[in-house]
């Protein structure tokens, strides 16, 4: 799979990190962590009950072990009893606390090393750590109690709106549930025209294109599953960045949001294929800031113009309702339990919107000849444009050398 490789070459992680608090490793554990635990510890006691201890260690040997307690968490010197031992530097530790790097992002970019334990055992602690820092609760099936309309009644999580519906009702649903489905926004003529443009772009995209994702099917054939920066090949698809209906609905999440027409992969298309056996043609449960960058990119809105039927057979978007307002554990397909899983069935001309940090997924189509196409346009706040230059993505920063020379190959955005 190939994806964006261009960028400014600047050490973005260092520049962005300097805009956030720098945490002294010793002072954080001695003073800040106890204070945070006094504020928010009760939010994590149930989640951490019985979870093995986690330790962080600097290169000079300074080490603190985090242990679950009946009142939250405590940190003690040394690594005795720690099932997981993470080695990192003070800059990376700060970036992790500031959510500029996730546990996954820190390991994948070689900014942290697991001396003991696994990435999963570090990630097991991650929602609780984020909750300590922010006061945001951890996502569980208890969310169903707050997925309510303006009168306090349970939301119909499968509700589809129309262009004639009340904007305040739509805004409330969007902000509470984290997604929105609006039927019939675009005409069949518009959909057909954009579909023709997509096929033109697809014909011009070849394996090795740094702005596209490629997968393999069971015959070994390479198939394109995502094409970024569509304006390279299509003026019409680039001009859609300023399409007023999409802009109006995206701004239900915030009037200051701007379309990312020239960064964060720009206008893009997802193409679902059947029989994908390797690559990112099918995406498990993820968030768009999964390797880091939450305060830089979020709130991030993904606006999807549906060009084909979306359902289990042809491929569809799934979301975990309300999860954008919580810290959350990684999960796999089949582990959703009683969480409010919503499968969005859509038709050509529909518009879907979702927050980038809602848990979402696009599972394999069940039909043998799937071909769903959906155009995506991102919307973000001004801060995102100030930090991320044109032609670049936050992930590019993570996968380029920083001041210490740490670098890794660019990976997918989830």
Language-model segment annotations:
Residues 327, 358-414:
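Non-heme Fe(II)/2-oxoglutarate
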Residues 2-165:
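Feature captures hydrophobic
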Residues 248-255, 278-345, 385-393:
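Catalytic core of non-heme Fe(II) oxygenases with the double-stranded beta-helix
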Residues 346-360:
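Conserved metal-binding segment of the jelly-roll/cupin
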Residues 107, 113-114, 181, 353, ...:
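Hydrophobic beta-strand signal
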Residues 151-176, 183-283, 400, 407-408:
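Non-heme Fe(II)-dependent double-stranded beta-helix
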């Amino acid at each position: 799979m190939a994806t964006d490789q261009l960028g400014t070459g600047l050490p973005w992680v260092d520049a962005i990190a300097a805009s956030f608090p720098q945490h002294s490793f010793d002072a954080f554990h001695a003073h800040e962590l106890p204070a945070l635990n006094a504020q928010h510890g009760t939010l994590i006691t149930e989640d951490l009950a019985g979870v093995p201890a986690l330790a962080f260690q600097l290169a000079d040997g300074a080490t603190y072990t985090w242990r679950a307690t009946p009142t939250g968490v405590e940190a003690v010197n040394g690594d005795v009893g720690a099932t997981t031992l993470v080695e990192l530097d003070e800059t990376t530790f700060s970036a992790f606390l500031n959510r500029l790097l996730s546990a996954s992002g820190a390991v994948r970019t070689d900014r942290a090393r697991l001396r003991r334990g696994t990435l999963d055992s570090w990630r097991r602690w991650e929602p609780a750590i984020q909750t300590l820092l922010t006061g945001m609760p951890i996502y569980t099936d208890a969310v169903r109690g707050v997925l309510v309309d303006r009168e306090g009644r349970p939301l119909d999580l499968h509700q589809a709106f129309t262009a004639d519906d009340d904007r305040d009702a739509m805004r409330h649903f969007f902000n509470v549930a984290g997604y929105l489905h609006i039927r019939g926004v675009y005409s069949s003529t518009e959909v057909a025209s954009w579909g023709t443009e997509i096929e033109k772009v697809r014909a011009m995209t070849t394996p090795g294109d740094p702005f596209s994702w490629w997968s393999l099917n069971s015959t070994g054939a390479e198939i394109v599953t995502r094409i970024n920066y569509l304006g390279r090949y299509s003026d019409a698809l680039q001009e859609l960045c300023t399409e007023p209906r999409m802009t109006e609905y995206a701004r239900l999440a915030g009037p200051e949001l701007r379309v990312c027409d020239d960064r964060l992969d720009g206008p893009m298309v997802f193409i679902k294929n059947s029989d994908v056996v390797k690559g990112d043609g099918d995406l498990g449960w993820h968030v768009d800031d999964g390797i880091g960058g939450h305060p830089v990119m979020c709130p991030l809105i993904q606006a999807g113009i549906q060009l084909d039927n979306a359902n289990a057979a042809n491929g569809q978007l799934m979301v975990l309702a309300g999860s954008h307002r919580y810290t959350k554990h990684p999960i796999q397909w089949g582990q959703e339990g009683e969480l409010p899983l919503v499968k969005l069935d859509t038709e050509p001309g529909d518009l879907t919107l979702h927050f980038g940090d809602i848990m979402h997924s696009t599972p394999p189509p069940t039909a043998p000849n799937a071909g769903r196409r959906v155009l995506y346009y991102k919307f973000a706040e001004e801060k995102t444009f100030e930090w991320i230059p044109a032609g670049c993505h936050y992930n590019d920063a993570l996968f380029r050398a920083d001041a210490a020379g740490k670098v890794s190959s660019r990976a997918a955005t989830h």
